[in-house]
């Protein structure tokens, strides 16, 4: 092979690797449920908050709907899927666990969107949306947790049938007495949500 080609390939790999390494939240690997409304993480998602050295770990098996954006708003350029999707997974997880306050979770969403290169207008629209309408999801998650429902599927239950929707599978797991696996201590990351500034 020509030396120039090899040098070009090495430079290209370095550039691509550098760009990928700078992504605050790597692209998630997900498996859809039958209706493609809910998705299960096939691999753990890790988000390093700014330069803090602190990481939020969303475990494999967590079920997300990405961004809970009402369908009428999709025609205005906002859908559940976009550059903000990875930040939305972290936000869904924070809303589910509720170890942080709701405001901290919303601020961490905004920080993650800033670091993910989401446009300022979309950051504002999504942040205003979760501040105005997120209480319903927060309360729904609180009630589901109190009722013993899960949103993190244990390793031995990850291979769900492709024809099943999440609400049906969740009920099956509940009826079988399946519990969520233990997750990491959130105390290190919640305080970064006391402001919306990237640390």
Q: For each predicted feature, which ranges?
A:
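Short amphipathic alpha-helical "recognition" segments used for binding
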Residues: 7-8, 75
């Amino acid at each position: 092979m020509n030396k120039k080609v090899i040098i070009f390939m090495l430079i290209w790999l370095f550039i691509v690797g550098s760009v990928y390494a700078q992504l605050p939240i790597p692209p998630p690997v997900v498996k859809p449920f039958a209706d493609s409304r809910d998705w299960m993480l096939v691999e753990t998602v890790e988000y390093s908050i700014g330069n803090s050295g602190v990481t939020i770990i969303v475990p494999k098996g967590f079920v997300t709907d990405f961004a809970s954006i009402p369908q009428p708003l999709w025609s205005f350029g906002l859908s559940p899927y976009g550059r903000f999707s990875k930040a939305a997974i972290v936000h869904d997880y924070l809303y589910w666990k509720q170890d942080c306050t709701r405001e901290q979770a919303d601020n961490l969403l905004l920080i993650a969107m800033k670091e993910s290169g989401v446009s300022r207008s979309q950051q504002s629209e999504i942040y205003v949306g979760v501040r105005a309408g997120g209480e319903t999801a927060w309360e729904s998650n609180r009630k589901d947790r109190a009722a013993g429902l899960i949103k993190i599927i244990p390793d031995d239950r990850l291979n769900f049938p492709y024809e099943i929707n999440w609400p049906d599978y969740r009920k099956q797991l509940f009826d079988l007495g399946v519990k969520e696996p233990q997750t990491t201590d959130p105390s290190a990351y919640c305080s970064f949500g006391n402001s919306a500034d990237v640390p």
